[in-house]
Amino acid sequence: MHQHMLGPSTSLGGTNNSALQSSVLSEGVLLSHSQPTREEIKKNFETREGVYRSVPSAEFSRPRPLPQYHMPPGIASAAASQIAAAGSTVRVSFLNGAEKSVESPEAVAPTSSTYEHHKNEPNGARIDMVDEAQADKICFNVGKELYVFSYRGTQTETDLSRPIDKRVYKGTSPTYHAFNQESAKNGSCQLLIGFTLGQLQIIDPLEKSSSSPFSRLYNEDRYIEKTSVTCIRWLPGDSNIFLASYVSGNLYVYDQRISAASSNNNGSSQPPPWTIHKEGDKFAIHTWKGKVQRNPVTRWQIGEGSIHQFSFSGSDGKMMATVSHDGFLRIFNYHAQELLAVMKSYFGGLLTLSWSPDAKLIATGGEDDLLTVYSVAEKRVVCRGQAHKSWVSQVKFDPYLCTTEEDLENNGIAMTSTFDDVAKDFSIRSGPVPSTSADLNSGVMNATSTFSRCSLASFNTINGAPAGNSVRYRIGSVGHDTFLCLWDITEDMLNQGNIRRHRNSTIIAPMTTLEVQTNSLVGRLEDLQEVSPGGAGVNASSDSQSITNNHTTPRPEKQKKKKFTKRLGFSKFTSGSSSATSNPVGGHKIGTLMNGASVNSESSKKQNPGLISQISCCNETRMLGSKFCPGIRDVPMIEPLMCKKVSHDRLTVLEFREDCVVTACQEGYICTWGRPGRYQPKRDCINSPGTASPESGQKPSGSTSAMTSSYGYGSDALNGVPPSRSSSTYSNSEQQLRSPNITSPSYRVSAASTSVYHRPTYAWQNAN
């Protein structure tokens, strides 16, 4: 039987003994796959504010089953993992519906019951169409498929057989997507999608009545860019501008008001006629030659390697931060097109970033397995966090658990600086960083709702009195190790002069011996220039003076060498040679740090000034121990408040909602975790006939007559009947995305194939 399943055994030596060994080996492989060993994952986890509970009725997954081919459970599970790994990264995006009160959960309950009562009516009729239009929307991609569903947080009752929109692409896969929050209205929205072959598409997944559905293609012929899309964003405050980053390290700015077909090659094999508009340290901005407006309007070349992610600060979009494969976090003034600050990862590339609600901090994560918190105003690393055992794939600030001005005033605590101070500092850039000792003005964290003030009134207090280490920020992180970690950033951690051990932090002990210089941070930064807009060096004496004031011990005349150990390797930062350059603008010498030592050479004055612009501050930040990449002992190493295994496959998504937390893994399962006091499990509705969650073993009831999209770039099916491939409803601009070498015809999934894929049930799911 095993030979029939795995194929005939191959004789290595031509004897029966070899054939027997091969058969035994095949059987052993089969048994190892059929009995996989998996760690238990958690259905709930506890923090200081309460218990977060899994919401089985609000789970999403791919409705389509795996290929119809009978395999043992272990083999099937392994095949599912391979199929998921072969596709693009699973991403989740949300469209916020109409504003609704969240003061009392009872106000939302009738909505859920009304939907539950009418969702099984013939032909999927729903009486409360107004409520359906006002509900939030969730979009996620799994492999070559894209789905859009209604989402109500902890009140969601998932029916995977009836998506709002569903698309399958042939020859390419969605890699990233984002809703246009600025232009969304009842019954209409814009969803921007990026693909592995570099194309971009804007669709309206809510439009069902029009005979010519809205669809717009950018970079259709791959003339502008041929690599995969890594991240896309809509410009805050502008419903027409969106940006897309690529594996090539390019970031393009598009304008919907300009024709999407204006950048076609028209049969020419020549590259696009870009011209440099502005250039700085490791970045350049290009525009089109001539006065004719084209899409994309500008191109940013940033760093070396792929731009993994970028994000804007707050709702005004004044600053833009990027993280790249070269390990750099770069912060730009987007409108002025100036580089404001940089930071280097401890090791490897950076994969993700997140702005704090007040735009004063940035959290990053990547291949060094560390969480890094960076202060934008002070341009320094606040702390690092170690808990993950693999790459950190997503970090997010929780806007509902960040302390507001009102909370701090009630607790008798004053904050340090405002976003206006940060923006003013970056817009002027004509002097040293202003002092951050001013009191807080009004309007700091508008993103924080009443949830943190009402439900978590005692979050920063002990028996009604202000806590000593007041929690200012809550950060979440997920990684390839399948763990979800929550971190608290306290007031003490934000104090630059306070390097003592915190209650929730510790300095990691060394493991491997490495001989480096352990002189003070002042000595390491003395001969380094500061990052300035456009790459020009400025006098850093003010920063050096401020750092000197924070250290009471004088710099020793002779540096002493000590041996300490490290947990993470950084051999790429060390070298057997040393060099130095001089700054032609400010006249300061730039000592390159090699093995922790600062070296100044008189011969550097004779270097070509043209080379200095190429090996300026970005090369300096590669050196471990500098201001831009502090050593392991230079900043506090904190521990997480909570770290739990919540998935069997690597996690790729983390989103904080008002009543829940959303995670997603590469297998394509989107899970909802109800916040404390916002969800109570109900056993009678978890496995209800109308609920088709991935955890349940029952098939959904009701009709499967939901309209199915034409897959590729085609329109949605009309009257529930998908058009044929030869239908005239497909226009030339709605052709399917595919590789030029692919000749197979497009296909679409019929209604019969919308059956629910049954996720294997594990022991933890039946636990109380």
From Swiss-Prot:
Q: What happens when the gene is disrupted?
A: 25% decrease in glr-1 expression in the ventral nerve cord. Changed locomotion behavior with mutants displaying decreased reversal frequencies consistent with decreased glutamergic signaling.
Tissue-specific expression: Expressed in several neurons in the head and tail.
According to the UniProt entry, which residue ranges have a biased composition of type Low complexity?
570-582, 724-733
Per UniProt, which keywords does this protein have?
Answer: Repeat, Ubl conjugation pathway, WD repeat
The WD repeats lie at 224-264, 302-342, 345-384, 454-497, 646-683
**A GO BP term, please?**
positive regulation of protein deubiquitination
- Per the record, which residues fall in region Disordered? 103-122, 531-608, 684-749
Organism domain of life? Eukaryota
Pfam families attached here? Answer: WD40
Q: Which InterPro entries match?
A: WD40/YVTN_repeat-like_dom_sf (IPR015943), WD40_repeat_dom_sf (IPR036322), WD40_rpt (IPR001680), WD_repeat_creC_regulators (IPR051362)
The annotated regions of Polar residues compositional bias extend over: 539-553, 595-608, 688-712, 734-749
Q: What does this protein do?
A: Together with wdr-48, binds to and stimulates the activity of the deubiquitinating enzyme usp-46, leading to deubiquitination and stabilization of the glr-1 glutamate receptor.
The record's PANTHER family line, in alphabetical order, gives:
AT02583P (PTHR14107:SF16), WD REPEAT PROTEIN (PTHR14107)
State how it assembles: Interacts with usp-46; the interaction increases the catalytic activity of usp-46 in the presence of wdr-48.
**UniProt name for this protein:** WD repeat-containing protein 20 homolog
What is the organism of origin for this protein? Caenorhabditis elegans
